[in-house]
Curated annotation (Swiss-Prot):
Region (Disordered): 170-199
Location in or out of the cell: Cytoplasm
CDD domains on file: YlxS_C (cd01734)
SUPFAM superfamilies linked to this entry: YhbC-like, C-terminal domain, YhbC-like, N-terminal domain
HAMAP family attached to this UniProt entry: RimP
Name of the protein: Ribosome maturation factor RimP
Keyword Protein biosynthesis among UniProt keywords: no
Gene: rimP
Biased composition (Polar residues): 177-189
Length: 199
């Protein structure tokens, strides 16, 4: 997370917890019209997977947080608040979240190059809390990644195991699309997995 994202999480986490949710992390993105503040909330880990975040939950958190931000004013200027459930391809923001998703496949973007690259994809082998490292298995090799050097990290779901793999288009369908002069969509059924996003 950016410094601004960390500041906002520290401010809002207690408020979100009072509403019965965990604030996983925040994204603060500057855009021409001002800024976008994205908050990712989830059900407390002990209550998963029996309970899931609903759109109504996102709406309620959005209302409460918006009113709170109006009072505290941690952001100057115009901004748009978005509250979302993490989804299957969730972002990972903390070492604790990496540890919780042990043995999951992740994509990691780095601030500075490590192991010859700024982009890595591998399974989470372990988390070294003391040193602040995430150990990934990349192409059969264990690589220790400095957590402070991680810009973004996201779970890579096994769509096939979830029964959400994209269906192959038949030649007839492909030809029909071409004749209609329409660009084929890359969106798979997996992209339609439930994710509540409230603005």
């Amino acid at each position: 997370m950016s410094d601004k994202g960390i500041e906002i999480v520290n401010l809002l986490a207690p408020k979100v917890e009072m509403l019965g949710f965990d604030l996983l992390g925040a994204e603060y993105v500057l855009v021409p019209s001002g800024a976008i503040l994205r908050l990712y909330i989830d059900i407390p880990f002990a209550m998963q997977p029996e309970c899931m975040v609903s759109i109504d939950d996102c709406e309620r958190v959005s209302r409460e947080v918006s009113a709170y931000l109006d009072l505290e004013e941690p952001i100057s200027g115009n901004y748009t608040l978005e509250v979302s459930s993490p989804g299957l391809d969730r972002r990972l923001f903390t070492l604790e979240q990496f540890a919780r998703h042990h043995n999951h496949l992740v994509k990691v973007g780095l601030k500075l190059q490590q192991h010859g690259s700024r982009r890595l994809q591998g399974k989470i082998v372990r988390v070294e809390q003391v040193g602040g490292f995430v150990v990934l298995l990349v192409n059969g090799v264990e690589l220790a990644v400095d957590f402070n050097n991680i810009d973004k990290a996201r779970i890579v779901p096994d769509w096939s195991a979830l029964g959400l793999a994209p269906l192959e288009k038949s030649k007839h369908d492909t030809k029909k699309m071409s004749q209609g002069n329409k660009k084929p969509s890359n969106e798979s059924a997996a992209r339609q997995a439930v994710r509540g996003v409230i603005r």
